[in-house]
From Swiss-Prot:
Gene Ontology cellular-component terms listed: DNA-directed RNA polymerase complex
Keyword Nucleotidyltransferase listed: yes
Subunit structure: The RNAP catalytic core consists of 2 alpha, 1 beta, 1 beta' and 1 omega subunit. When a sigma factor is associated with the core the holoenzyme is formed, which can initiate transcription.
Stated family: Belongs to the RNA polymerase beta chain family.
CDD domains: RNA_pol_B_RPB2
Keywords, alphabetical: DNA-directed RNA polymerase, Nucleotidyltransferase, Transcription, Transferase
Catalytic activities: RNA(n) + a ribonucleoside 5'-triphosphate = RNA(n+1) + diphosphate
Record has Amino-acid biosynthesis as a keyword: no
Organism: Enterococcus faecium
Primary gene name: rpoB
Protein's name in the database: DNA-directed RNA polymerase subunit beta
Length: 1208
């Protein structure tokens, strides 16, 4: 029998796959989350100590007291990981620091251990638990400190150059040329000054000294001419100092002294200026004479200063071979020159540089000075005058065609700040704030009784750490949809965040794939949308070195023998640029030599065919180019990169299913990614399994000790999916360290299992799979193939209010006994109860405002105590769409010793679990970016069936393949069918997987037709379809975008306070917005009444909508609408601007716009006051008139009486 395609490989203890890989793995994959764990470990071991030694000792202003750092230790954490989760606490350990306070006057020394706050600890999975939730600190990609040179072209097409010295923290120093070939410097983005001014300020004042140091060049002459000696009373150095000060502090009186202090503080004070180790390394590397002199012609004879021997003659071209003999002499300080700055310069120490004269490539007659910075050691973290002079020399040499400009997007110039460093920077900020406080306290308090404890205020330190974990852009809520999402999140690299880029400013170049990403950052996996290219993923084999640069492993090629050795070198991007690297799939002979004379290789950005004697290194593995999620896509090499990007991103959104299956067609990456994700339960020591059940596994170690492993059951993950582990070991099984004991969510037999292997066919069916829609068999619903479990957490807290404490109780006003049937005697729902939208979970009442009680109420109050008081129902109810089964209830009270936030007496958490079957409207996807929405679930009997009667599970649209160019799915379909027939699992690693021949050979081996197509019968009629069809097994996943979370409808619900219009969005139980364009649509059809009710009764006619509701309930005709509230708001806004706005009818009579509150008679408005005043005036006038009439009447009577008397 012919040998079968592929060979069997074992993944873990429980799974074998037939692998089609041709290249044997030379190097194991590293631990995939070591970027997190190693960095944090470094921080605990070294980073913290570095920080303390940086800030301390702190001296007081007089220099009498000194506070020194002795040591620190982290004590035992207060909570375990599980307890921190349950109590909404932090998983952290108390940090204790031993400090020593020395009084230099009395010689007294006091040492004391000071508590420095709780420090968050990293869990074994590489996460932090902050306030009970798991968070990940994402690594940041930033520009590395160092010295950079760039070319620029001005608007007239003239070429110029620029240079920047970037520190880790401190002032930037920039150099540039202008159109007249004059060189300028800028300090910290201020106005520019001629380059020679800064040189003079450093203490090299005369023109002769400047020409002696830098040599003669046109640019330098132009600059010196521009920089005239204006004030003869100052020396050139003093004048230079004053010029610099004027630019840095415009408007302040300038003196040479203040300028000296300022420049010293800006560049030469280690507290304010820090290049960091990486900056010093990059500066030395860039200014290194060995690389700068390559291929130039010497303009002087170089002599060994010790023996006087000639090393290299004048006129020699400095090739690689010559440089190899010259290198040791250069490193030992060949041609060192010491310059002595003038007494009034910024720096008074002598400056030693190396100067070597060469001929200019542009003008072979002219000599040019190349200045090196004299190799300072690593501890020098500030910039030195020699560095400034050497970088100026490099800058001036660029005009002569010596040296090269830097590519800012090259990964040799970008570095990673991982957790440890980000934390260290944050800690430094806290310590620096604390330092100020300590200094102040030293000067205020009595020195005799002072102790370190009294000096230290830990608040700023604690606050800065808390702020970092709680609100930094890089501290993110962990994506825990499935283990792959979890793993990818920990390996993410972000260019955003503090000190990084912003989305709006990031251009195309920064986001683009760069050749230096090869083997370091994945070219595929990045989000679609505004963050594309700014958020990346670490490649599978990549590591981060001590300087923060990403390294990737290569196999060394022995140049003498031509053998590819198994010796692995990790190279950073800038070192790799010097070598030629062959691809991993270059054919090799048995003895490790190349099988062909010419191989494909990479030299910087070029892909070339190279003869094998020029090759220095070879790739370790074909999958070193891509990230973990991308490496899980079979036949990646047959997919278009845009679709592969979607495939890699969508795998992270797969929902864990009830009984997942590992893919039949895998890539061999499934085991490693599941093992390292943190979701699996791993064995810590070799031993034998002694006990297994659903909640615990016990392993007896070889040395007799017993290890207990608790299994997590149905815990809610960060994304609301179910986090559940299942044992996969048996009693008596021998296990080794690192073996998988229990599967986590989305795992099967220790492998990542995000979805299911389903029988698929590419064919259209009645138009139901138009536009990528998916038709599915009811079997997948019935057999719970795509059923997932979702857990939601709801909480209710009883607080103290001004009117008295809230109470959790069964006795709720206006709630019938039927609604309380599942509540216990405390008023809390029982576990296992089935609840629907709006059902009570926790009964709670809040006291209302106390009104004056009548005599009867007082009597009732005296008899029944509190019960008669007025309370409001504030119970926790199941929100819209949250129904399910109560899975767990947790109760936290003060009495039980739980830590609750201030003012809270009791906290109840209810967990509701939902079992969601697959539905029309759910989103599904394959691994090749082929996504779609389920459009129809059909009975099994209507689905097309195979000749043996097997009904198809899923029908996909064949039109989804050609234009998308993800052919990988077709190959997966065929190979999957063959694997199903043969009953095997296969592995086809990326870029080294099954070839077309392998696929067809396996298809034939499985006894399928040679073109892998088959006759298919219509399930409704039993007739065969016209053509033969591709049927196979595809691995399909159900994504987190489920219709249950998105579908939403509202009849009545909450309204916005000001406009009285319905709220929007599912979360607020809002309505559908009927916007401007929708109004136009109704206007176009003249649908006046429909439009009127949409704008009034259905929206913000407050009175009208209540009356409409009543009318509908009573079955009466709907009343006419009133005035919309938004119109009233408009009127009020205009009135508030002081405009007298009134509403008139057709007859110009004013219409009363009654306010909503006018129903309350006791409310006094401005109109009412005016009316009242008018009424008062009218009453007074009436009274006066009445009095007048009365007076007149009295007069008449009096006259009458007088007349009568006269008659008598």
């Amino acid at each position: 029998m012919k040998s079968l395609a592929g060979h069997v490989v074992k993944y873990g203890k429980h799974r074998e796959r037939r692998s089609f890989a041709r290249i044997s793995e030379v190097l194991e994959l590293p631990n995939l989350i070591e970027i997190q764990t190693d960095s944090y470990q470094w921080f605990l071991d070294e980073g913290l100590r570095e920080m303390f030694e940086d800030i301390l000792p702190i001296d007081d202003f007089n220099g009498n007291l000194s506070l020194e750092f002795v040591d620190y230790e982290l004590k035992e954490p207060k909570y375990t990981v599980a307890e921190a989760r349950a109590h909404d606490a932090n998983y952290s350990a108390p940090l204790h620091v031993t400090l020593r306070l020395t009084n230099r006057e009395t010689g007294e020394i006091k040492a004391q251990e000071v508590f420095f706050g709780d420090f968050p600890l990293m869990t074994e999975q590489g996460t932090f638990i902050i306030n009970g939730a798991e968070r990940v600190i994402v690594s940041q990609l930033v520009r590395s400190p160092g010295v950079y040179f760039h070319g620029k072209v001005d608007k007239n097409g003239k070429e110029g150059f620029g240079s920047t010295v970037i520190p880790n923290r401190g002032a930037w120093l920039e150099m540039e040329t202008d159109a007249k070939d004059i060189s300028y410097v800028r300090i910290d983005r201020t106005r520019k000054i001629p380059l020679t001014v800064l040189v003079r300020a450093l203490g090299f004042g005369s023109d002769d000294t400047i020409f002696e140091i830098f040599g003669d060049s046109e640019t330098l002459r132009n600059t010196v001419e521009k920089d005239l000696h204006k004030n003869a009373s100052d020396s050139r150095t003093e004048e230079g100092l004053k010029d610099v000060y004027e630019r840095l502090r415009p408007g302040e009186p300038k003196t040479a002294d203040s300028s000296r202090n300022l420049l010293n503080a800006r560049f030469f004070d280690p507290k304010r200026y820090d290049l960091a180790n990486v900056g010093r390394y990059k500066v030395n590397k860039k200014l290194d004479l060995k690389t700068r002199l390559l291929n130039l012609t010497l303009a002087e004879t170089l002599v060994d200063p010790e023996t006087g021997e000639i090393i290299v003659e004048k006129g020699t071209v400095l090739t690689h071979q010559v440089m190899e003999t010259l290198a040791p002499f250069i490193e030992n300080g060949l041609n060192s020159v010491t310059y002595y700055p003038s007494e009034d310069g910024v720096v008074t120490d002598p400056m030693t540089v190396q100067v070597i004269k060469v001929f200019s490539p542009k003008d072979p007659e002219r000599e040019v000075n190349v200045i090196g910075n004299g190799y300072p050691e690593a501890p020098v973290k500030t910039v030195r005058p020699a560095d400034i002079i050497a970088s100026m020399s490099y800058f001036l040499n660029l005009m002569e065609g010596i040296g090269n400009v830097d590519d800012i997007d090259h990964l040799g110039n970008r570095r990673i700040r991982s957790v440890g460093e980000l934390l260290q920077n944050q800690f430094r900020i806290g310590l620096a704030r604390m330092e100020r406080v300590v200094r102040e306290r030293m000067s205020i308090q009595d020195t005799e009784t002072l102790t370190p404890q009294q000096l230290i205020n830990i608040r700023p330190v604690v606050a800065s750490i808390k702020e970092f974990f709680g609100s930094s852009q890089l501290s993110q809520f962990m994506d825990q949809t499935n283990p792959l999402g979890e793993l990818t999140h920990k390996r993410r690299l972000s260019a955003l965040g503090p000190g990084g880029l912003t989305r709006d400013r990031a251009g195309y170049e920064v986001r683009d794939v760069h050749y230096s990403h090869y083997g370091r950052m994945c070219p595929i996996e990045t989000p679609e949308g505004p963050n594309i290219g700014l958020i990346n993923s670490l490649s599978s084999y990549a590591k981060v070195n001590k300087f923060g640069f990403i390294e990737t492993p290569y196999r060394r090629v022995d140049r003498q023998t031509g053998r590819v050795t198994d010796q692995i070198d990790y190279l950073t991007a800038d070192i790799e640029d010097h070598y030629i690297v062959a691809q991993a799939n270059s054919p090799l002979n048995e003895d490790g030599t190349f099988a062909q004379d010419v191989v494909m290789a990479r030299a910087q950005s070029e892909n070339l065919e190279v003869s094998i004697d020029k090759v220095d290194y070879m790739d370790v593995s074909p999958k070193q180019v891509v990230a973990v999620a991308t490496a899980c896509i079979p036949f990646l090499e047959n997919d278009d990169s845009n679709r592969a990007l979607m495939g890699a991103n969508m795998q992270r959104q797969a929902v864990p299913l009830i009984n997942p299956q590992a893919p039949w067609v895998g890539t061999g990456m499934e085991y490693k990614s599941a093992h390292d994700s943190g979701a699996a339960l791993l064995c810590k020591h070799d031993g034998v399994v002694e006990f297994v059940d659903a909640s615990q596994i016990r392993v007896r170690r070889d040395n007799g000790a017993l290890d207990k492993y608790d299994i997590t059951k149905f815990r809610r993950s960060n994304s609301g999916t179910s986090y559940n582990q299942r044992p996969i070991v048996h009693l008596g099984e021998k296990v080794e360290k690192g073996d998988t004991l229990a599967d986590g969510p989305s795992m099967e037999q220790g492998e990542m299992a995000l979805g299911q292997n389903v029988l698929s066919v590419s064919m259209t069916w009645e138009g139901y799979n138009y536009e990528d829609a998916i038709i599915m068999s009811r079997r997948l619903v019935k057999d719970d193939v795509y059923t997932s479990i979702h857990i939601e957490e709801y909480e209710s807290e009883a607080r103290d209010t001004k009117l008295g404490p809230e109470e959790i109780t069964r006795e709720i006003p206006n709630v019938g006994e039927d609604a309380l049937k599942d509540l216990d005697e405390m008023g809390i729902i029982r576990i296992g109860a089935e609840v629907k939208d709006g059902d009570l979970l926790v009964g709670k009442v809040t006291p209302k405002g106390v009104t004056e009680l009548s005599a009867e109420e007082r009597l009732l109050h005296a008899i029944f105590g509190e019960k008669a008081r007025e309370v409001r129902d504030t119970s926790l109810r199941v929100p819209h769409g949250g129904g399910g089964i109560v899975h767990d209830v947790k109760i936290f009270t003060r009495e039980a010793g739980d830590e609750l936030s201030p003012g809270v007496n009791m906290l109840v958490r209810v967990y509701i679990v939902q079992k969601r079957k697959i539905h029309e409207g759910d989103k599904m996807a394959g691994r090749h970016g082929n996504k779609g929405v389920v459009s129809r679930i059909m009975p099994e009997e209507d689905m097309p069936f195979l000749p043996d009667g097997t009904p198809i599970d899923i029908m996909l649209n064949p039109l989804g393949v050609p234009s998308r160019m993800n052919i990988g799915q077709v190959l997966e379909l065929h190979l999957g069918m063959a694997a199903r027939q043969l009953g095997i699992h296969v592995a086809t690693p990326v870029f080294d997987g099954a070839s077309d021949e392998d696929v067809w050979e396996t298809v034939r081996e499985a006894g399928m037709a040679s073109e892998a197509k088959t006759v298919l019968y219509d399930g409704r009629t039993g007739e065969p379809f016209d053509g033969r069809v591709s049927v196979g097994v595809m691995y399909m996943i159900k994504l987190a975008h489920m219709v249950d979370d998105k579908l939403h409808a509202r009849s009545i619900g909450p309204y916005s306070l000001v406009t009285q219009q319905p709220l929007g969005g599912k979360a607020q139980f809002g309505g559908q917005r009927f916007g401007e364009m929708e109004v136009w649509a109704l206007e176009a059809y003249g649908a006046a009444y429909t439009l009127q009710e949409i704008l009034t009764s259905k929206s913000d006619d407050v009175v009208g909508r209540v009356k409409t509701y009543e009318a509908i309930v009573k079955g009466e005709p709907i009343p006419k609408p009133g005035v919309p509230e938004s119109f009233r708001v408009l009127v009020k806004e205009l009135q508030s601007l002081g405009l007298d706005m009134r509403v008139l009818d057709i007859k110009d009579a004013e219409i009363e716009l009654r306010d909503m509150d006018d129903e309350d008679d006791d409310l006094i408005t401005v109109d009412a006051l005016t009316k009242f005043a008018e009424q008062q005036t009218a009453k007074e006038l009436e009274k006066k008139a009445a009095e007048q009439v009365e007076d007149e009447r009295q007069d008449v009577i009096q006259n009458f009486e007088t007349a009568e008397d006269k008659l008598d």
